[in-house]
């Protein structure tokens, strides 16, 4: 008997948690800044923590105006073969505005992985440090 199918269970559970099982996104609070994570990548970029506080929902960040440290996890390939993040990254930004909408976009150049923070007009306002990858 092969154990290979059993190795897929944690990954499948994570995919279920992050997809339809997670429910609809909450409505954005106009007193907070909302940060989407770009879904069009072949990798899954997930929200991990804000200012060191872990998040319950990895699909978005919502922060008060001002300076914050966002921590992200990246599952490369998003093929369900791993429930552990392949890379961890962080982005510091001091200009979050109430009611502002931002988007985090993962970018890879060879082995280097990072994320750019874009404002509502699509302009880059911050860049993460290079991610730490396994």
Predicted region positions:
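Short loop/turn and low-complexity linker motifs enriched in small/turn-promoting residues
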Residues: 21-134
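Sec-dependent bacterial lipoprotein signal peptides
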Residues: 1-22
């Amino acid at each position: 008997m092969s154990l290979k199918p059993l190795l897929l269970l944690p990954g499948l559970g994570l995919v279920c948690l992050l997809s339809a099982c997670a429910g609809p996104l909450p409505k954005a609070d106009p007193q907070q800044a909302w940060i989407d994570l770009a879904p069009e990548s072949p990798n899954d970029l997930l929200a991990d923590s804000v200012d060191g506080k872990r998040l319950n929902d990895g699909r978005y960040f919502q922060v008060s105006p001002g300076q914050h440290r966002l921590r992200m996890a990246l599952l490369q390939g998003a093929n369900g073969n791993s429930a552990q993040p392949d890379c961890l990254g962080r982005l510091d930004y001091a200009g979050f505005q109430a009611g502002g909408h931002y988007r985090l976009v993962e970018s890879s150049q060879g082995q280097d992985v990072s994320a750019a923070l874009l404002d509502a007009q699509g302009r880059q306002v911050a860049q993460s440090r290079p991610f730490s990858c396994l």
